[in-house]
Amino acid sequence: KLKNSILEIKEKETDCNIVYSFNRLNNYCGKWIRHCGLYPDKKIRIWNRNIGMWEGKIHETIKFSKETKEVRLHGDLLHYSFNTHEDFRNQSFRFAEMKGESYFSKGKKNASLLKIISPMFFFIKNYFLKLGFLDGKDGFRICLVYAQATKHKYDTLKRLYNCQSKQHK
């Protein structure tokens, strides 16, 4: 379905200020994940390269140089993300560490309360409110790793502030 949507836009002459998005369906250890906050995993991935570029260390956002109009394409991009739970956990923690470093470089303060509340909130939101339990044991494992990675992000931020304060003594 997505392939046909892309072929349709290629055949048409389109406005260069239009950006195209679609849903990404993630595969975790051989299983399609439709909950846990991972679906629909909307991504903008098609745009005129003269009006936009990636910004951030881990492709966090796309920055457009002018006003754009987003058009949603039909179909899912099948994303074979992780073959093993360990791969998933390692990448989640690597991205969390990068996010903690980003917070530090932007001067975000280390809030001890956030370190406690955010992981719990993240788990509750994704496992219960976003129906992660419907993905069974895998849904539980995914939500648990994301909660742990959220804590790791704040641990990284705290570690960086501790290192900074030791250097200033």
Where are these regions (language model features)?
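N-proximal low-complexity "stem/linker" segments adjacent to membrane-targeting elements
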Residues: 166-169
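Catalytic-site signature of metal-activated, phosphate-bearing donor transferases
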Residues: 1-164
